[in-house]
Amino acid sequence: MATTKTSIATLQKMKREGTKISSLTAYDSSFAKLMTEQGVDFILVGDSLGNVVQGRDSTVPVTVDDMIYHTQCVRRGASNAFVIADMPFMTYSTPEQAYDVAAALMQAGANMVKLEGGHWLVETIEGLKTRGIPVCAHLGLLPQSVNVLGGYKVQGKEQQQADDTLNQALALEQAGAQLLVLECVPASLGKRITEQLSIPTIGIGAGADTDGQILVMHDMLGMNSDYLPKFAKDFLAQGGSLADAFRLYSEQVRSGEFPTAEHSYK
């Protein structure tokens, strides 16, 4: 059971020491409590709740009130956990809007907020940092931009796009981001970015060389019998119970057993 409160300093220390970071999404108190007890290092209250909780076909309809409610639920269940909350679609289109939404999520129990996007977020991230709000950046596949991207596709496969993603990662780190999620990029790009950043990188479909891994809880529990993303694994089938599934996930991320090349993109 997690008895010591995790902080961003904990995650930064893990990167320096080469200890892999395990993280999962959660949306309620019971699952947040259980996964924290089984060694998961931090929790993301993801706007993926639009898909897996609300049954929508994207994250776009998720509201700030939705995120506040689920962040409060997660915090009640996991008082010592490091909790990151997603900022919903079009709630950080200006720095001033971002400050208000981020403050509400922090007051709901988040330790950090996550924003999707690249260079255009530099001013916003600088402003959030100045105001004492820690930021997790998110590059690669951006679910909130799925309509622009034309679907859920691997990003950064072409050299120019890969170089641009790296440059954006460096700019966001310089602006003050303290964590970076990389989603659905080639494993080689995940490794390249991780080696050049001083902040921890958390991959989802970004290969085994990022500083940590994150999965949507429903994916790693195999809850969608019709579809399992390439980058996911059904840990419940292997573990046999929810507690063992979370424990196995944390252990296999830590040991490097997960993810394998099978779960990665070229």
UniProtKB/Swiss-Prot annotation:
<feature type="binding site">
    <location>
        <position position="86"/>
    </location>
    <ligand>
        <name>Mg(2+)</name>
    </ligand>
</feature>
<dbReference type="GO" id="GO:0000287">
    <property type="term" value="F:magnesium ion binding"/>
</dbReference>
<dbReference type="Pfam" id="PF02548">
    <property type="entry name" value="Pantoate_transf"/>
</dbReference>
<feature type="active site" description="Proton acceptor">
    <location>
        <position position="183"/>
    </location>
</feature>
<keyword id="KW-0460">Magnesium</keyword>
<keyword id="KW-0808">Transferase</keyword>
<feature type="binding site">
    <location>
        <begin position="47"/>
        <end position="48"/>
    </location>
    <ligand>
        <name>3-methyl-2-oxobutanoate</name>
    </ligand>
</feature>
<dbReference type="InterPro" id="IPR015813">
    <property type="entry name" value="Pyrv/PenolPyrv_kinase-like_dom"/>
</dbReference>
<dbReference type="InterPro" id="IPR040442">
    <property type="entry name" value="Pyrv_kinase-like_dom_sf"/>
</dbReference>
<keyword id="KW-0479">Metal-binding</keyword>
<keyword id="KW-0963">Cytoplasm</keyword>
<feature type="binding site">
    <location>
        <position position="116"/>
    </location>
    <ligand>
        <name>Mg(2+)</name>
    </ligand>
</feature>
<feature type="binding site">
    <location>
        <position position="47"/>
    </location>
    <ligand>
        <name>Mg(2+)</name>
    </ligand>
</feature>
<comment type="function">
    <text>Catalyzes the reversible reaction in which hydroxymethyl group from 5,10-methylenetetrahydrofolate is transferred onto alpha-ketoisovalerate to form ketopantoate.</text>
</comment>
<dbReference type="GO" id="GO:0003864">
    <property type="term" value="F:3-methyl-2-oxobutanoate hydroxymethyltransferase activity"/>
</dbReference>
<dbReference type="GO" id="GO:0015940">
    <property type="term" value="P:pantothenate biosynthetic process"/>
</dbReference>
<comment type="similarity">
    <text>Belongs to the PanB family.</text>
</comment>
<dbReference type="InterPro" id="IPR003700">
    <property type="entry name" value="Pantoate_hydroxy_MeTrfase"/>
</dbReference>
<protein>
    <recommendedName>
        <fullName>3-methyl-2-oxobutanoate hydroxymethyltransferase</fullName>
        <ecNumber>2.1.2.11</ecNumber>
    </recommendedName>
</protein>
<dbReference type="GO" id="GO:0005737">
    <property type="term" value="C:cytoplasm"/>
</dbReference>
<feature type="binding site">
    <location>
        <position position="114"/>
    </location>
    <ligand>
        <name>3-methyl-2-oxobutanoate</name>
    </ligand>
</feature>
<keyword id="KW-0566">Pantothenate biosynthesis</keyword>
<comment type="subunit">
    <text>Homodecamer; pentamer of dimers.</text>
</comment>
<comment type="pathway">
    <text>Cofactor biosynthesis; (R)-pantothenate biosynthesis; (R)-pantoate from 3-methyl-2-oxobutanoate: step 1/2.</text>
</comment>
<feature type="binding site">
    <location>
        <position position="86"/>
    </location>
    <ligand>
        <name>3-methyl-2-oxobutanoate</name>
    </ligand>
</feature>
